[in-house]
Amino acid sequence: DHEFDAVVVGAGGAGLRAAFGLSEAGFNTACGTKLFPTRSHTVAAQGGINAALGNMEEDNWRWHFYDTVKGSDWLGDQDAIHYMTEQAPASVVELENYGMPFSTTEDGKIYQRAFGGQSLKFGKGGQAHRSCCVADRTGHSLLHTLYGRSLRYDTSYFVENFALDLLMENGECRGVIALCIEDGSIHRIRAKNTVIATGGYGRTYFSCTSAHTSTGDGTAMVTRAGLPCQDLEFIQFHPTGIYGAGCLITEGCRGEGGILINSQGERFMERYAPVAKDLASRDVVSRSMTLEIREGRSWGPEKDHVYLQLHHLPPEQLATRLPGISETAMIFAGVDVTKEPIPVLPTVHYNMGGIPTNYKGQVLKHVNGQDQVVPGLYACGEAACASVHGAIRLGANSLLDLVVFGRACALSIAESCSPGDKVPPIKANAGEESVMNLDKLRFADGSIRTSELRLSMQKSMQSHAAVFRVGSVLQEGCEKISQLYGELKHLKTFDRGMVWNTDLVETLELQNLMLCALQTIYGAEARKESRGAHAREDYKVRVDEYDYYXA
């Protein structure tokens, strides 16, 4: 048993920012993470972080606000978006003060590149250059900068501790219970405030850009605690994942001048989006690519991908602005970008939905049609859904989301509590269900391997709830996923030990993934409209009445 003023679950960009924000304010803070902090998935973000700094041309946060609301397909929470875009320039300056090595222009300002869906003057002033970047490794720099910063403070890190469940009492959150992967010990971390920053659940799909650790642990913990999730059916497909490997090729490539071509050598985006062309918003590009592939204007023996061409760009531009991409393409596709195009395919990239919060990061539940704050529980980052992204996220808004809302969680805890406040007691047997579940899985002796069941789930999500969705296929998907969820009882685990039992951890992650997959596909089936990333072929129109009541 441990006792803290606050505990943060997850140590990616949002988790670290929340944790050292709390420590800075004098709170005795714990940060539990199943990975070493710099292994978190934030490290894989490539493109950049949006802020209306106006280094490349005149810019205004209100224009960024407009683009984000429009980009969310009018589902985003405008208070939260207002807060995020207004805070953006200060957040980027703060990062630079922490020592983040941004790419710069010749006169020493932060370099900003063009990204999809970004405009000037409320959509009337043409393409905006708003995405501050560190070549094509922005997330890597961000995470290492934040981690370096967090070491100045006295935060207690529980590294390689897998959070099992929230400790809830009388509708309040009193902390978390976690498994230490290193020695198999169980830790109850009691705290007055708990922040969930566990990232997304991209691994519910077969082809995705997320790390194998993006298993929606926080989302599932909240579900098990009987709290609602929001907008899980909105899943962003990134237009350019490497064919076969799923590795991400940043939108920055198209921001620097790369183009998509079909098997006739035609730059097909000119047909679908005459103005923005290859920098249209991500759902538009993904759907256009899918249509080209369906209609047979695609490459490969199975005619199932298109090409991203960069070799018309000068080699020195590729070397300075996109060094990591040249390397990634070589390793995962065997392609030399200066001579040949990269095979790409739309790939699951980001979860817009998650744990519902307000712009202060407080988790909400829905009681009699009203939002109600869950005492002691906060969420930020990809796990949360303050809904700054609505139905589809704009590129380079996610790193901004991490830093702004990680900080917001720390600030709102500091507003409502002070360091050293008494931690409310918990029942002596709190968390015993989690331990029972753990033991049950450790000795599980059924007929299906974890990996087999996981693969069936990923394949069925990929085929039933992809870029285009139809009612009949979604219903079939709901039945299939429900059936697979039932098969969790028949799992077989092989490692009975307690030390570094990865078999057990993967099985726990599968339980979490299943809960996310179930809610996602049922949500998609129930949302009878097309909006943002959720494109229904049988309901092609957006239903604006949905904006006003919970579907």
Curated annotation (Swiss-Prot):
Cofactor: FAD
Major place of residence: mitochondrion
Transmembrane segment boundaries: none
Positions where Tele-8alpha-FAD histidine occurs in the chain: 41
Pathway: Carbohydrate metabolism; tricarboxylic acid cycle; fumarate from succinate (eukaryal route): step 1/1
Annotated catalytic residues: 282 (proton acceptor)
Binding site residues for FAD: 11, 14, 33-34, 40, 42, 47, 163, 217, 382, 398-399
Modified residues annotated as N6-succinyllysine in this record: 121, 192, 277, 427, 440, 480, 489
Gene Ontology CC entries for this record: mitochondrial inner membrane
Modified residues (Phosphotyrosine): 157
Catalyses which reaction(s): a ubiquinone + succinate = a ubiquinol + fumarate; (R)-malate + a quinone = enol-oxaloacetate + a quinol; (S)-malate + a quinone = enol-oxaloacetate + a quinol
Family assignment from sequence similarity: Belongs to the FAD-dependent oxidoreductase 2 family. FRD/SDH subfamily.
Subunit-level organization: Component of complex II composed of four subunits: the flavoprotein (FP) SDHA, iron-sulfur protein (IP) SDHB, and a cytochrome b560 composed of SDHC and SDHD. Interacts with SDHAF2/SDH5; interaction is required for FAD attachment. Interacts with TRAP1. Interacts with LACC1.
This protein's name: Succinate dehydrogenase [ubiquinone] flavoprotein subunit, mitochondrial
Organism name: Mesocricetus auratus (Golden hamster)
Gene encoding the protein: SDHA
